[in-house]
Amino acid sequence: GLLLLGTMLSSWVGTTGASMLMVRPMIKMNAWRKRRSHIMVFFIFLISNMGGCLTPIGDPPLLMGFMRGVPFFWSLHLLPILIFNTVVLLTVFYFLDRRAYRKDIAEGRKPDISKPGTEVHILGLHNLIFLAMIVAAVILSGTLPGMVAFQDVNGAVKGIPVFEDVKLTYPALIEVVIILAAAFLSFKTTKPEIRRKNHFTWGAIKEVAVLFVGIFITMQPALMILKAKGAELGITEPFQMFWATGLLSSFLDNTPTYLVFLTTAGSLGFTEGMQTILGTVPVAMLEAISCGAVFMGANTYI
């Protein structure tokens, strides 16, 4: 039940948010069991990755696509694929878990619901307001650049010059300000006791921040090369895009991998399909890249 609920939440609160929300109850509910390692494997596949495929908020690769012209709700095209894969994985999980559960019971293990902390409590519901602010900020980041008020006479998005040709666009600045404001208000208005009980630390956030800064800086030359030479790779079919994106997403971060192959697809010269900043991408190919990045990103922790 928790796996299905978390999978449904992932596209609307993000895979990271859904994982943080569901992991503590999942661990506590199964703490009495000896055979439980398989639970986190399915947790990672379903909640931490696959469940986020329906919106750009769900998984970072789709956010990169949204920022490059893919419509916000286009990812809902992946719903049938998500349903099929979720049913398959939950069916496999059911039989594996039932077998492990019966072995634990046979050895005399059983849950002790008398211990403190075994009841489910939902605290901090006011944070839904700040979550809505973040969702709005993401949507604005993709819609504001198309408005005349944010464009100069040449049609380019206005912004603040940072370094040579690099500039911080006003839509991006608005997005950052709203998200930081939501985070600040959440931190200040939520009782510290709630974070303490959830064992909240800044460690994971710092690690992800450092990792992403490094990845996105070093990937720029590769993206420029692919934009110019992508058509020469010989990857022209959706199934090729799916496996190439998926395999690399398993060992690299799936966000830059998605961006690399979206750039490649946009450079192939297609005339029919989804219009993006990077070029026209056939719908089937965009679906293949999206599924490869989101679904196979679960194969390793990276």
What is each model feature region?
Residues 1, 27-30, 93-99, 186-200:
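C-terminal ends of transmembrane helices
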Residues 2-8, 44-53, 110-117, 204-217, ...:
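Small-residue-rich segments of transmembrane alpha-helices in multi-pass membrane proteins
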Residues 4, 8, 83-91, 95, ...:
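Generic alpha-helical transmembrane segments of integral inner-membrane proteins
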Residues 10, 20-35, 39-41, 47, ...:
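Membrane-interfacial helix-loop connectors
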Residues 35, 54-55, 73-119, 295-302:
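Juxtamembrane and boundary regions of transmembrane helices in multi-pass small-molecule transporters
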Residues 54, 59-75, 137-149:
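Transmembrane helix-loop junctions at the membrane interface of multipass transporters and ion channels
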Residues 89-156:
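Long, contiguous bundles of hydrophobic transmembrane helices that form the permeation core
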Residues 131-269:
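Transmembrane helical segments that form the transport core of multi-pass membrane transport proteins
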